[in-house]
Structures are given as structure tokens and as C-alpha cells.
Amino acid sequence: MSTPAAPLDKDAARYAELDRRLVAAVRGVRLLESVSWPAAAQEKFLAGWRVGKLAMPVIEYRKHDFAAVREELAAVEKACDPAHPIGRYLHLTCESWRIATRLLDVVGTHRVTAFSTRLFGRPVEMLPGEGPTNLEAAMHFVELADELDQELSTYEPAYVLPAEQVQAELQEQIDGFFGVGEVKVELDPTLIAKAAASPTRIRLRTNTGFSEYDRNQLLMHEAYVHTLTGLNGRQQPVLGSLARGSPRTTATQEGLATLSEMMSG
């Protein structure tokens, strides 16, 4: 028999309600989905780039009205005490979502850079602990990856795995780790990236070839970082927003996912 959960204290109960309001307010804000190019535009751009004919596509970004979202975020933020640990967490999370909506207001214009910088930083900014810069750190890992690629190229099979095979193999491995039916691996013809993950679903781009190395990277990157983080957040009894994350956690999430690829080989 499971032990009943202890009742929340007054502060925790209040912040749990504010967190629920935050989650409800940003439910329709899809940052990556809103700024992604259509698959056809991406393919045309890359095809031109490969033959030295670089031409930027003209993208018609869908416009949204986020005024009500920002109003609710401001109300939640105002109700938080920034000196309280949960209050500070909600304050920073509301702020990052508000910046994200401002970015989406101006997507497709040069003004997007200012909001993107506030969310994700700049290449020349120093990492905590007196550096290096983001760019220098990235180049360091690129060099390590290049060395690894040279070693792996000797052993990497020349054949390409179809998306359907990778889907089946990943599903088997994921079922063995998370439990059967907990996380589904699906094919998506509209996906821009090769893969994307949520707490309960990992999508692979249809009609795309994968290498053996790709398959292993996907397991580490998508399943063991993004999906596992989301599932862990869902187990948090007070702050449901941890299941989704926020724009301010993107850099950490992607950094962990990329590092997991490299550490696992």
C-alpha cells in the first residue's frame, strides 16, 4: 500500500497553484516549431548550398497574439517572492517565457537577434568560472568530435539504415529501459530535424537515412537526456512546469545531450 502524500505547507501550496497557472499560460507557445523552416524550404536551401548556390528562402512565419499570455505571466511573476527559492524559480521561468513570446512577435526580422541573445546568450560570452567563451568551448568539442570521427570511420559500416529500422530498434531498447508502452518512437514526415523528443514520444524524420552511429546518438541524446528529463519532471508533485522545461533551460538540456553523445562514443 502506498503512503499518502504529506499535505503541502502554505507556501508550497500557493506556489503549486502559481506553477499551474504558468503551465496553462504557455501551453500554446511553441518556440522551436514556430521558428522552424518548412521541410521543403530546408531541403531546397541545403541542395543549393551543396552546389555553391546559396539563396535564403522567403519564409512566411505565422503570427500570434501573445498579449494575454504575457499578462498572465506578469500576474504570476508579481505574486512570487524572488527571495523564496520556488518564487525565484517561477520568476526566472516566467521571464524566459515572456522573452520567448517577444521573440515570436518579431520572428523573420532582424529584431529577433536581441531576444534570442537574452534567452540563449552569444558566442563570445564567457562560460562561468572565467571562460572559455561559448565559441571556444564549442570549437574544442568539435575538434574532439573530428578526432572521434576519424577513428570511427574505420569501423562505421557504409550502409544506411532506413528510418523504419531505426524506429523498431530504438523502440526495443527504449521499452527495455523505460518499460513497454511508456515512450513511443514514431515516424514524422514533417519533422525538420532528424529527431525530436518529449516525455512520452520520440519522433524520427520519415524518408531519412541513419548510420549506426546516428542510432546510438539518438538513444543517448533524445531518450536518455530529453525524454528522461521530462519524465523525471513529471514525477515532481509540486512544480508541473519541470516536466516541460522552459526556454531558459534549453542551453543546459542541449549541452547535456551533446555531452552524453560524446561520452558514450
Segments the model singles out, each with a brief description of its role:
Residues M1-L135:
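N-terminal low-structure segments adjacent to metalloprotease catalytic domains
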Residues H91, E164, Q217, T250-E254:
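Conserved structured core elements
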Residues N216-L231:
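Active-site recognition of the HExxH zinc-binding catalytic motif
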Residues A243-G265:
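Post-HExxH zinc-binding segment in Zn-dependent metallohydrolases
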